[in-house]
Amino acid sequence: MGVYDAIRKCVAFVGYPNERGFSAIGTGFFAYIQQGGLDFGYFITAAHLIRNKRPVSVRINKKDGLSETQETDTDKWIFHCTKNMDICAYPTTLNPRGDTEPHDVLYLTIESAALDGHELHESGLTIGDEVFISGLFASREGEKRNIPIIRTANIAAMPEEPLWPSPAVSYLIETRSLGGTSGSPVFFDLSRAGVTKKAEPPIIGLINQTGGSYPIMIMPYYFIGMILSSHAQRYEDDFFPDGPQADAEFNAGISVAMMAHDVLSFMNDDPNMRRYRDNIVEKKTRAIGHRPSTAVESSPDVRNGSSS
């Protein structure tokens, strides 16, 4: 199946600078949600990529054809309140002035793009259906900029029981390829199932272009989850080993994917995420004397982890 190229703009690579430029260990994606009418942007990825003693960096593509590597502040990462939920978020600056925004990114409008709950049931998504994954291929991350690839895959098992040690049920996806997908978003082309989720296409994201940011509708792609690992592995020790792992070393061809429901629940309802947003709104309100019309100016920038 053909895939609209803009979907690759929602991802960036997680890793470390090295003598060649950058060594990627996994993927993450940009998404934003609203709370109280305010926009909050995040970089979402798998927590096991971040839970180590060394601060990780994120390499983001730019409109000039190059990229920018930004070291993250370890203390700014927001982890799920349940330790074994393998997801975390880094607050970013969502710049509505696309003509001055150097980064070539697509922020997923996660709430309208997600296939969840009743709509997931109505979609008919089932074992054997084809899905696609946007993310890193570990053998070709790109020298000057990220080169995300699109992997086509198939649902090997629908979410039924938790896969130890995660407390949440997950998809098993036959990816037929090696590592690098941890933290990658997974999409389903609903048109191939012969059904339509809504009368109107979803606003799947906000894309920065010269002249400003604008909503982009990519019908009928829907977000169904996030890759946790590109292997099915029972860890005998701590679920989060001390340091990154090359999951290609014990790749089994089966990826474990967190459901969109759990990604949405983390972003909307997790106490750690809500506490962060509540603090931002409170500080902004005190500073200007009334409820702000946007939270963008207060959101930490992935470039330096600072807040205004």
Predicted regions and their residues:
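Short, surface-exposed secondary-structure edge patches
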Residues: 3, 33, 120-123
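C-terminal subregion of chymotrypsin/trypsin-like serine protease catalytic domains
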Residues: 4-6, 188-304
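Serine endopeptidase catalytic core focused on the charge-relay Asp
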Residues: 8-11, 16-18, 25, 51-175, ...
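A conserved glycine-rich beta-strand in the N-terminal activation segment of trypsin-fold
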Residues: 11, 17-41
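Cytochrome P450 catalytic-core helices
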Residues: 45
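Histidine-centered active-site/metal-ligand motif
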Residues: 48
